[in-house]
A protein has these predicted regions:
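Bacterial N-terminal signal peptides that target proteins for export
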Residues: 2-20
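Sequence/structural segment immediately N-terminal to covalent heme-attachment motifs in c-type
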Residues: 37-47
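Outer-membrane beta-barrel pore domains
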Residues: 165-168, 172, 285-479
Length: 479
């Protein structure tokens, strides 16, 4: 691939990376030509901006490429036509400095002595750190047979398969029939795996993973990758898209258990189902819009069949669902995304009551909640993006109204980030990111930044407010 040569300014930036980490919050980035994600750039010779709003987020052309099974629908698609030295792999990791803080936490009166009483207080910590590492293999095995395998580790190099699937594309010579089997991300309204924000409190979508207080449903949320099969289709420009997936009720875990290697949580021998429909259209000089709807419906066990006291498989399965809608608007340098979700867990799941023990009390009910997010991105150039997001979740019905106040678990979160790419070439890319996120929740911690407690555990009333924040400076790179 003929890529653009780095300018002298870019060379100086690369040589001065340590100083840039400290100065990144006030740097004024100079626009540079942006190229592609390495693996596919080397294969097709296209600039990164052809497929990406900003790596790793896709634009509509990139969505079409992905929907086609990582194919441009030309003579370069089959790997047999590529140079033998071509290998479809990308490695990504993020060295970083971050600070995490939360109030109304349990603080021992005498440090090191948990028996000497405690009081509510604020806990903070900061320092240099690493993200996990992704080793991503993806491409085509043959014309119209694509694959992805993504071994992913945490900060301590403990690996798991984030995804691993094979997809048969354009069945019966039509883009409306594509079949995938394995472990994969659901076709969500907004992909969490391509999220640009990375901080402890801002590096995920809360509504994709929310579980009410004391809820026993083992389902981790629609943001978790799942094991199963998917039928999907789209028109030529992916303005009209659909997916339907049938999934094992394992929350993405292998081995027919709900927790990796934990025999105490076997699967419920049921299937879950997910569907998503999306329609895009031009708005006559006002950009491009997409609207859509989605739903996840499943069952989870409330007790287990045992053998000599050892749980073998789940029984007493009860239903739950997540359903909602989306709206996205691409206009000039702006991208606005919004997602709404309504959640429901059956009363037995929500209260952790085995369904073979009798009836529920008069105060025990199904858990219901509503939430979502609104995110805006200002795309100054393909190398410089500013992101802001507001998220909210509100309980509409608690599982047990006799003990849990109605607003317990409600949250509001705000995240703002600045992401600048000094370079992105066909062999490697680098992004400097500065980010701040803030979360307020009622009664119970819903944050992701490293602290967690109930207000009552910290000696406060159930209706206290827990606030947490994350400050993040990172160097996100792939090659």
């Amino acid at each position: 691939m003929n890529s653009h040569s780095p300018s002298k300014f870019t060379d100086r930036v690369v040589s001065a990376v340590p100083a840039l980490v400290l100065l990144a919050a006030v740097l004024l980035p100079a626009p540079q030509p942006a190229n592609a994600i390495p693996a596919f750039a080397r294969k097709y010779g296209l600039p990164c901006s052809a497929c990406h709003i900003g790596w790793p987020e896709l634009n509509n052309f990139g969505q079409v490429f992905r929907d086609n099974g990582y194919q441009m629908m030309n003579e370069r698609d089959s790997p047999i036509t590529r140079d033998p030295s071509y290998f479809p792999i990308t490695i990504r990791i993020t060295p970083q400095w971050h600070r995490e803080s939360a109030n109304n936490q349990i603080v021992d009166n005498s440090p090191g002595n948990g028996e000497g009483g405690s009081h509510p207080g604020t806990l903070s910590t900061s320092g240099f750190d690493l993200s996990g590492m992704d080793i991503w293999f993806a491409g085509t095995l043959y014309k119209n047979i694509s694959f992805s395998a993504l071994p992913s580790s945490d900060q301590n190099a403990s690996f798991h398969f984030e995804n691993a699937f094979v997809r048969f594309d354009n069945l019966l010579h039509t883009p409306w029939l594509n079949f995938k089997v394995g472990k994969f991300e659901l076709d969500l309204p907004v992909s969490e795996k391509r999220l640009l924000t990375m901080s402890g409190d801002g590096g995920f979508y809360y509504i994709y993973h929310f579980t009410p207080l004391n809820d026993a449903n083992p389902f981790g949320g629609i943001g978790d990758n799942q094991l199963g099969m998917e039928l999907a289709g789209h028109n030529a420009n992916s303005y009209t898209r659909y997916t339907f997936a049938a999934l094992s009720s394992l929350d993405g875990n292998p081995g027919l258990v709900l927790s990796n290697g934990n025999p105490a949580n076997p699967a419920g021998r049921t299937f879950d189902y997910y569907g998503h429909f999306e329609q895009g259209f031009n708005t006559f000089g006002n950009g491009f819009m997409k609207v859509g709807a989605y739903s996840y419906f499943g069952f989870a066990p409330t007790f287990f069949q045992t053998s000599n006291g050892v749980p073998i498989y789940g029984r007493g399965n009860k239903p739950f669902y997540r359903a909602g809608a989306e709206w996205k608007w691409y206009f000039n340098k702006w991208l606005v995304k919004s997602v709404y979700l309504h959640g429901y867990d059956n009363a037995f799941l929500a209260n952790g009551v085995p369904s073979n023990t009798g009836t529920l009390s008069a105060t025990q009910r199904a858990a219901k909640w509503n939430g979502g997010f609104l995110e805006g991105q200002y795309i100054i150039s393909p190398q410089w993006i500013i992101i802001a997001r507001w998220e909210t979740i509100h309980m509409s019905q608690q599982a047990d109204i006799s003990i849990t106040p109605g607003d317990t678990g409600n949250l509001n979160a705000f995240t703002i980030a600045n992401r600048w790419y000094p370079f992105m070439f066909s062999r490697a890319g680098l992004a400097l990111q500065q980010e701040y996120s803030f979360v307020r929740s009622n009664g119970v911690t819903n944050q992701g930044g490293g602290f967690g407690t109930l207000c009552t555990d910290a000696g406060r009333a159930f209706n206290c407010t827990i606030s947490s924040s994350s400050l993040f400076f990172g160097i996100d790179f792939d090659f």
